[in-house]
Amino acid sequence: MNPNQKIITIGSICMVVGIISLILQIGNIISIWISHSIQTGSQNHTGICNQNIITYKNSTWVNQTYVNISNTNVVAGQDTTSVILTGNSSLCPIRGWAIYSKDNSIRIGSKGDVFVIREPFISCSHLECRTFFLTQGALLNDRHSNGTVKDRSPYRALMSCPVGEAPSPYNSRFESVAWSASACHDGMGWLTIGISGPDNGAVAVLKYNGIITETIKSWRKKILRTQESECACVNGSCFTIMTDGPSNGLASYKIFKIEKGKVTKSIELNAPNSHYEECSCYPDTGKVMCVCRDNWHGSNRPWVSFDQNLDYQIGYICSGVFGDNPRPKDGTGSCGPVYVDGANGVKGFSYRYGNGVWIGRTKSNSSRHGFEMIWDPNGWTETDSKFSVRQDVVAMTDWSGYSGSFVQHPELTGLDCMRPCFWVELIRGRPKENTIWTSGSSISFCGVNSDTVDWSWPDGAELPFTIDK
């Protein structure tokens, strides 16, 4: 092979190698592009699947469930058809109260991230029950818990978590900025009512499914406040009671009818000798019954019952088994205020059954200790102090606090009646204990027509905490 042939041969081989290398590079680029496209398409497809979108001819809503995984909120979509909670059923017949939940939040909060709270309450949709609570913008066993005995501050917020769980930043969802609040579900969405602002000009912010729908301004400029428990929904309308005015004298009390977050009607009660605060309300056969706190001059509890047009009746529980705290020893009651030890009070509740009444109350007459349920078969209309059932749920030696009612609709339970339930706040810390903070845990019970038991389900936390020493 002469030199020219060698040059041509070597050149040809180099050209072939170069072409092959170019083809390989192009193939590599195409392969990377295809791989990227497949991954992107797969991620998009997975996202669509996780949303689990189903199209119905009727309306649907998305219930967001927060799952605590490595301190990360993961939202799992769950589509469900909406219903209307009619509230037309009567209360279920019951023989006693079965323990439903206990969150142990103070015990857990000694070592875990748990909110400093007060005023917890429970409300149920047709799918779930949630614990609502007013945080102090602080965690237990942390320096910002100092001074949280104060009721009203710009740091307080209404939040909620699954019932029975300790309220923490990892399982709770924000509802509203508030130092007084209420919430309820009409079958289609959550209504929340959060009151915040200065004492002489507070505003209630109404939200429906998380969106602001209306506001209500303080009309007496004297600490506008609401229930600190669930509102009541009947046939798509929800009802709440607000108070504005003195806590130790005649104030102004209004009932609000709300549809999808918008006030459609309101009325002021004509109750010149009554005092209504922190009402515990529930639906019963298409009407709403509220049992409230008289902080002015009554040691028995005032009530107001109204229909969907806000036509109302008022009175006091007549029984000589008194339900407020402080209160005198049981004796002769009154269908008006019982003035003995009538000043001050505590949020509470009762359930009416015809002429009879289940009364929830602290075991102590003078302090927020213990809790018991009493069945007075004639207590709604008669003034004697005879009762036939007493069930203890918190011992006299253990702390209690606020209490309130909530119901489970037939759409949730599958029963043909409205199940009555109640919760009890177990307050710990200041002003009675040597801590820098005030907070509470909660327990709840539901009525059953079967066997129950007397016991004590106390808070159980050992104080003081590290931050208090």
Curated annotation (Swiss-Prot):
Q: Involved in apical transport and lipid raft association: where is this region?
A: 11-33
* Cofactors that this protein relies on: Ca(2+)
Query: Where is the segment annotated Hypervariable stalk region?
Result: 36-90
Q: How is its activity regulated?
A: Inhibited by the neuraminidase inhibitors zanamivir (Relenza) and oseltamivir (Tamiflu). These drugs interfere with the release of progeny virus from infected cells and are effective against all influenza strains. Resistance to neuraminidase inhibitors is quite rare.
**Which residues, renumbered to this chain, are glycosylated?**
N44, N58, N63, N68, N88, N146, N235, N365
Residue ranges spanning the membrane: these are 7-27
| Cross-referenced Gene3D superfamilies | 2.120.10.10
Residue pairs linked by disulfide bridges in the UniProt entry: C92-C417, C124-C129, C184-C231, C233-C238, C279-C292, C281-C290, C318-C335, C421-C446
Spell out which residues lie on the membrane's Virion surface side: 28-469
Instruction: Give the domain of life.
Output: Viruses
Intravirion face of the membrane: 1-6
Tell me how this protein assembles. Answer: Homotetramer.
Q: What is known of its domains?
A: Intact N-terminus is essential for virion morphogenesis. Possesses two apical sorting signals, one in the ectodomain, which is likely to be a glycan, and the other in the transmembrane domain. The transmembrane domain also plays a role in lipid raft association.
**What's the protein here called?**
Neuraminidase
Q: Which organism is it from?
A: Influenza A virus (strain A/Henry/1936 H1N1)
What does the organism's lineage look like at the top? Viruses, Riboviria, Orthornavirae, Negarnaviricota, Polyploviricotina
Q: Which gene encodes it?
A: NA
